Amino acid sequence: MAISDEPETVATALNHSSLRRRPTAAGLFNSPETTTDSSGDDLAKDSGSDDSISSDAANSQPQQKQDTDFSVLKFAYRPSVPAHRKVKESPLSSDTIFRQSHAGLFNLCIVVLVAVNSRLIIENLMKYGWLIKSGFWFSSKSLRDWPLFMCCLSLVVFPFAAFIVEKLAQQKCIPEPVVVVLHIIITSASLFYPVLVILRCDSAFLSGVTLMLFACVVWLKLVSYAHTNYDMRALTKSVEKGEALPDTLNMDYPYNVSFKSLAYFLVAPTLCYQPSYPRTPYIRKGWLFRQLVKLIIFTGVMGFIIEQYINPIVQNSQHPLKGNLLYAIERVLKLSVPNLYVWLCMFYCFFHLWLNILAELLRFGDREFYQDWWNAKTVEDYWRMWNMPVHKWMIRHLYFPCLRHGIPKAVALLIAFLVSALFHELCIAVPCHIFKLWAFGGIMFQVPLVFITNYLQNKFRNSMVGNMIFWFIFSILGQPMCVLLYYHDLMNRKGKLD
């Protein structure tokens, strides 16, 4: 027997009864005897009385429908009618739980989450008061961070230099090896120049992080710009030699070095260069205003959680590698929830709000800045889905070029994580002036987790196992531990300087 998920209701039973005793078209509203008699009378009547017949039928419809419903109800759920007809499972049993809709439970979780966090916020304010201060983000030194600001503005020099090199290469004024060397010099200078400025200036943490993020974005864009133009020159030479290009390239633009294309690429929410992008027809001003309001609100929420919850927790903690183990575990677990809230707010503010705002202003069409990484079954799925601009850059300019040069997939994956770890370390360690390789080690630790979660996924064929491991390692253990490590090292450094 087939197991049905639909519960049998009274309406279903009524329907079954009506199906078993469905009247014919001629006897829909009358009994069989009445139908036989009336049919004989109708043959004797004049055919010109159609209007009177239709009027009588219209008047008798409510009464006839009521009689039919009563007839159906008369035989519905009688004691002799079986109440159990099919083999059925309970809605929460293991065989049917994932085929049920849990929208009501999801709403309940939201209500409970709002209620519990509202109580915690009120309790925190009553116990500790208003703790928000700007000193951690913008101190008196922030006004003296003008070298970092000037360095940020001067980063546009490097794309302009790359454009000059590409223009010379297009006109065949310099050979290809010289083009490659010049691009290596330009991209390296665009990254090391901000690092030197930050290390020489004792700037605020947020100012240093902002400059390093800008520098990393410029470096990634310059690499994509140089690599894409190099590949387009190679394809152009192949066409000139008469070689046929495969249709899978999908290149709908010619090789042309344009400063307008470079300028648009520098401000567009993408890290992969191409001479033209899909564009939307117009700017939605109302939608843009709503996203700006959301950005302001969620940025404020993120700052509130950091100052009101995370800072007091880390200030009242010990170094996780030097104190009591149980105490360190308690601090990490206590820090995990507000840290997760901040990370989710950061993701929503940057990847959803800010990048979409920038795309709307520039009419940038491809807005797949992330995928459903929260459903990641493995650690590899998470890194492939949560940051699509970086992921597309990695597979376009690093991973597949490694495969084309005969490097095994495992080694290419290791190289991709190595590059990611280096940039994570630069963005955190340089502004903190601390080089303990905590961020680097945290990213490289993902490599064995990739193979472990892939093995578990293939062994158990259960998405829940990998997803829970991902959430535990990522939000409960990894990030809070890194926050505590960098905070205490930063405080120790400030104490030594003072």
UniProtKB/Swiss-Prot annotation:
Localization, UniProt: Endoplasmic reticulum membrane
Positions occupied by motif FYXDWWN motif: 369-375
Any one GO CC term of the record: endoplasmic reticulum membrane
Catalytic activity line of the entry: an acyl-CoA + a 1,2-diacyl-sn-glycerol = a triacyl-sn-glycerol + CoA
One Gene Ontology molecular-function label: diacylglycerol O-acyltransferase activity
Pfam family membership, one: MBOAT
Keyword Transferase: yes
Pathway membership: Glycerolipid metabolism; triacylglycerol biosynthesis
Residues at the active site: H424
Topology with respect to the bilayer: Multi-pass membrane protein
Name of this protein: Diacylglycerol O-acyltransferase 1A
